Amino acid sequence: GEQKLFQGVTLGDDKSIGKTFNFMLANPPFGVDWGKDERTKKRVQDDNCPGGRFEAGLPSTNDGSLLFLQHMISKMDKVNGSRIGIVLNGSPLFNGDAGSGWSNIRKMLLDRNLLDTIVALPKNLFYGTDITTYLWILENKRPAERRDKVLFIDAAHAEYTRLLQKNLGKKRFEVSEEGAEDILNIYREFKNCTRDIRYEKTGEVEHIEVAKLLDYEDFLYTTVAVRRPLRLWYENIKDKYV
């Protein structure tokens, strides 16, 4: 099919107005300040209206991650369906209390039944940062058995990685073929599951939960954290997503 590349500032200059796409992948810059450039800031604020790209709300100016996500959502094909994969830092999951722009955007994802899966990725996957990152998967034509639910996958373990022979900046690992295959299988099964995980510091192997399926209703009252030792757990903080 036709292939086109557009050079420009995504948030401030939409090069694909009126177009929709069936598959979209993105790794937007982490923590980009969308308020520095006045032209971009004005365009973003202008699109924060009913029917605009950013109608759900605006995050704080020091992190535009959820603006990039909303931009992609605005390009979803409502007839034939679309799937989005986007790598984000932890801010979109944890920042903002109830009523904030962050919270309103997250609420939109649930109200429209778009959020399908969030994968916590291992650290040291990127050249310029060693932070924990998350792969979000969204769909607008989800099958009945996946609707109103979100799957959290904890892939932030050495079992999912391959050590590089030479570091590339802060990038020390990449997701291994076996790790990617297991993540894909867990995503397809869309249910709770456990794996044997070895912890680096102790060398001990534990059989732990690496995937947790939540109803949207439960997710409204739940946040997810991944820390050392890397495991997934849930804390009840009702002021985050309501």
Residue map of PLM features:
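Conserved SAM-binding strand-loop segment of SAM-dependent methyltransferases
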Residues: E2-G8
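A conserved structural/catalytic subdomain of Rossmann-like adenosyl-cofactor enzymes
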Residues: G12-V242
